[in-house]
Amino acid sequence: RRRMKRNNLIQSKEKQQPVIEEKYRKSNVTEEECRRLAGELELLMQRDRLYVNPNLKIADLAAILNVSTYTLSYLFNQYLDKNYYDYLNDYRIEEFKRLVDKDEYSKYTLTALAELCGFSSRTSFFRYFKKVIGITPNEYIRSIGKTNEE
């Protein structure tokens, strides 16, 4: 059953790819522009930690970078090969891992930590964490020898 579900997911992604490519077929965003924009975006995320805002929209980020939402969407989907939310959530997961390594956060619940990292719900945090890391947040905390309140 699990294998069938996985195969359906793979087939679904294969069907989506041509749709995404068709959407950007007439794009005039250059590789050089993507490289530059990706660098600016990474610097912005590391310096300003925009990902901790759970309400951050792609339009907000595009305005900060002074590009269109189309260009930013192209950057994520074609150049970085991930969607906007996966990009943000990757930073949020790294933030979570950074926080749980600090003793001062050991009294926080997982939900509170997830919110500090920018996740808007416990469910989306748990789902994405397990998808990316392969274990639950609780299992991760135990694996690094820490404890928390949940």
Where are these predicted regions, by residue range?
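Membrane-proximal linker segments that couple transmembrane helices to downstream signaling/catalytic modules
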Residues: R2-A112, L116, Y128-K131, N138-E150
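The DNA-contacting recognition helix of HTH DNA-binding domains
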Residues: T69, S121-T123
